[in-house]
Design a protein with these regions (language model features):
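Active-/binding-site microenvironments in catalytic and ligand-binding cores
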Residues: 1-250
Length: 250
């Protein structure tokens, strides 16, 4: 998306190559006896299931806590608000299955989730949000994941006013979804092309989880669970891969 680099992994050491190169100077006999494999990875920080840090988007040159890029960002990342500052997240998780509430496997392209949609889904699920929840919305977009073009093209997502409801009224600590960008496009605000991101990250200090796999929770109708997830501690980074786990409460 947006010219982001692809994920790449390449083997820096192979069992056969180690015998030839002998990088540890152990000799042919030892290298033939003990095989060695190593690899390197290059990736964009927002690939796969990941969490956005509070420095990912800002407004008027400033991110969360009014930290300015000119003062706190360098060529090796931000010196403040990097994803390495996130502790392990252990909280009550809530799935809001908006697609299922509307009787659809997936919301229509470009559909913008409203507060009414969220309230309808919660009523159907017989669940109430609580302060400090990790709230995960399911537009159902993950069903297109294997088709990258379809997955990324005009996805349904969270509306700006619904995002404000989740934070200001419901008290969500983290907000996420199964789509690429959480929010729907085009923007509802002429002054901001990503208003949900800037509102959550720059104004409210609310991390965002994207590309969350929610299909199994939806299938099993697990709407409340213990959420546990820890991002990789990339110092100064604006996001990092996250491997979340949901433990049903019942």
């Amino acid at each position: 998306a947006a010219g982001d680099p692809h994920y790449r992994i390449w083997m820096t050491h192979t069992p056969e190559g180690t015998v030839i190169d002998d990088p540890l100077q152990l000799g042919t006999t030892m290298n033939q006896h003990v095989s060695y494999t190593g690899a390197a990875v290059s990736m964009y920080t927002h690939m796969g299931t990941h969490i956005d840090a509070l420095n990912h988007f800002g407004l008027d040159g400033k991110i969360w806590n009014r930290f300015a890029a000119k003062d706190h960002a360098g060529d090796r990342g931000w010196r403040v608000a990097g994803v390495e500052n996130f502790p392990p997240i252990v909280a009550r998780g809530v799935l809001i299955d908006v697609a299922a509430a509307k009787g659809k496997p997936m919301l229509d392209d470009g559909y913008r989730i409203t507060r009414a949609d969220i309230e309808q889904a919660l009523q159907r699920q017989k669940v109430e949000l609580q302060t400090g929840d990790v709230v995960l919305l399911r537009p159902g977009r993950m069903q297109e994941y294997e088709n990258a073009h379809a997955y990324m093209q005009n996805p349904p997502g969270l509306g700006y006013h619904a995002a404000r409801y989740l934070v200001e009224t419901a008290g969500a600590m983290v907000v996420g979804a199964d789509n690429l960008s959480l929010e729907a496009f085009p923007s509802q605000l002429e002054s901001d092309y990503v208003p949900v991101h800037t509102y959550l990250l720059a104004e409210q200090g609310t991390p965002i989880i994207e590309l969350a796999y929610l299909e199994d929770l939806s299938r099993d109708q697990v709407y409340e669970f213990a959420f546990i997830g820890s991002p990789l501690k990339f110092r100064g980074a604006d996001a990092a891969p996250l491997r979340p786990t949901a433990f049903p409460l019942d």
